[in-house]
Amino acid sequence: MKPGIHPDYHVTQVTCTCGNSFVTRSTAPNGVIRAEICSSCHPFYTGKQKILDTGGRVARFEKRFGKRK
């Protein structure tokens, strides 16, 4: 690595609005990052994810443009 061209890499405390916090490394200058969502409260990781109605979208597309054979 060339000296003097890379940003400083600090130990950083990340705090989520849900109250979860963890330590990582980052180039954040003050060593603190506030996040709105993390793996503890994100719906994908908590299992509370809602499945979108993609079947209805496909049916509507086929109705408008015809189903290919």
Swiss-Prot record:
What are the GO BP annotations of this UniProt entry? translation
In alphabetical order, the GO MF annotations are: metal ion binding; rRNA binding; structural constituent of ribosome
UniProt keyword list: Metal-binding, Ribonucleoprotein, Ribosomal protein, RNA-binding, rRNA-binding, Zinc
Q: Which domain of life is it from?
A: Bacteria
Check the record and name the InterPro entries matching this protein.
Answer: Ribosomal_bL28/bL31-like_sf, Ribosomal_bL31, Ribosomal_bL31_A, Ribosomal_bL31_sf
Where, by residue number, does Zn(2+) bind? Answer: C16, C18, C38, C41
Gene Ontology, cellular component aspect: ribonucleoprotein complex; ribosome
Q: Which cofactor does it need?
A: Zn(2+)
Q: Does the keyword Metal-binding apply?
A: yes
Q: What does this protein do?
A: Binds the 23S rRNA.
Note the subunit structure. Part of the 50S ribosomal subunit.
Query: Per its record, how is this protein called by name?
Result: Large ribosomal subunit protein bL31
Protein source organism: Thermobifida fusca (strain YX)
Q: What is the lineage of its organism?
A: Bacteria, Bacillati, Actinomycetota, Actinomycetes, Streptosporangiales
Q: Which gene encodes it?
A: rpmE
